[in-house]
């Protein structure tokens, strides 16, 4: 079962990315290092509800 998720920057709080994930394989919250436009650097982005 694939669901849409939103990734938010941990430093500024902006929701920069929308992605999909498989809940059966990845039950925990997703954390990825992505580029943040506001901070102009790569930061940790965490899955939000």
Curated annotation (Swiss-Prot):
<dbReference type="InterPro" id="IPR001705">
    <property type="entry name" value="Ribosomal_bL33"/>
</dbReference>
<dbReference type="InterPro" id="IPR018264">
    <property type="entry name" value="Ribosomal_bL33_CS"/>
</dbReference>
<dbReference type="InterPro" id="IPR011332">
    <property type="entry name" value="Ribosomal_zn-bd"/>
</dbReference>
<comment type="similarity">
    <text>Belongs to the bacterial ribosomal protein bL33 family.</text>
</comment>
<dbReference type="GO" id="GO:0005840">
    <property type="term" value="C:ribosome"/>
</dbReference>
<dbReference type="GO" id="GO:0005737">
    <property type="term" value="C:cytoplasm"/>
</dbReference>
<dbReference type="Pfam" id="PF00471">
    <property type="entry name" value="Ribosomal_L33"/>
</dbReference>
<protein>
    <recommendedName>
        <fullName>Large ribosomal subunit protein bL33A</fullName>
    </recommendedName>
</protein>
<keyword id="KW-0689">Ribosomal protein</keyword>
<dbReference type="GO" id="GO:0006412">
    <property type="term" value="P:translation"/>
</dbReference>
<keyword id="KW-0687">Ribonucleoprotein</keyword>
<dbReference type="GO" id="GO:0003735">
    <property type="term" value="F:structural constituent of ribosome"/>
</dbReference>
<dbReference type="GO" id="GO:1990904">
    <property type="term" value="C:ribonucleoprotein complex"/>
</dbReference>
<dbReference type="InterPro" id="IPR038584">
    <property type="entry name" value="Ribosomal_bL33_sf"/>
</dbReference>
